[in-house]
Amino acid sequence: MINIAKEHKVNEQIRVRQIRLIGGEGEQIGIIDTRDAMNMAREKGLDLVMVSPQAVPPVCRLLDYGRFRYEQQQNEKENRKRVRSQEVKAIKFRVKIDDHDFKTKTGHVRRFLDDGHKVKVTIMFRGRERTHPELGERILVRVAEALADVGTPEGMPSMMGMDMNMIMAPKQAPAPKKERTEESAEKAGSAGETEPVPAASAAAEAPANV
């Protein structure tokens, strides 16, 4: 597979006299004059794109440059999204948190999960609060229950210093599997509808002649 850089010389920007040309399907055409390659690109409704300027002669390819750039931008977006999904966000709660703050902070966690991030939920203990870890566990249970539709806890809560931590991971709905199950059920139902009725049963159900 040829690696095409973000910046390319395209069509009239290519000033060399000869190039090694690759066709739109990846086939090797060979070394030809750039002018002939340009004519070939016009005839096919494609662009002539230099993909390897350091080669001798430079390597060019026939392709739809606009479509290629669009696909490349989509791939870059997916890569950025994948990198973001590997980031772990952090939201901190106090042991003595009121309902308003709990709702606000839980909303932040929900947004991070919706964006595909993992979230470290931290319960911060003060003074003697540390002697009652069950208070922190209760808050973490509330968080997990409030976000059960979008996230799931990874492992058990753990203590680190004066903090109790729990990782929430985005929840992925098994939609494709459900569709396949429904499709199988429909096929089974269709098969049941076309199953022939045994002759003996049909005769038994038929009304008797008087």
From Swiss-Prot:
HAMAP family: IF_3 (MF_00080). GO terms for molecular function: ribosome binding; translation initiation factor activity. It is found in: Cytoplasm. IF-3 binds to the 30S ribosomal subunit and shifts the equilibrium between 70S ribosomes and their 50S and 30S subunits in favor of the free subunits, thus enhancing the availability of 30S subunits on which protein synthesis initiation begins. Residues 176-186 have a biased composition (Basic and acidic residues). Monomer. Pfam families: IF3_C (PF00707), IF3_N (PF05198). Belongs to the IF-3 family. Residues 187-210 have a biased composition (Low complexity). This is Translation initiation factor IF-3. The lineage of its organism: Bacteria, Thermotogati, Deinococcota, Deinococci, Deinococcales. SUPFAM superfamilies: Translation initiation factor IF3, C-terminal domain, Translation initiation factor IF3, N-terminal domain. Keywords: Cytoplasm, Initiation factor, Protein biosynthesis. Residues 169-210 are annotated as: Disordered. GO terms for cellular component: cytosol; membrane. GO terms for biological process: ribosome disassembly.
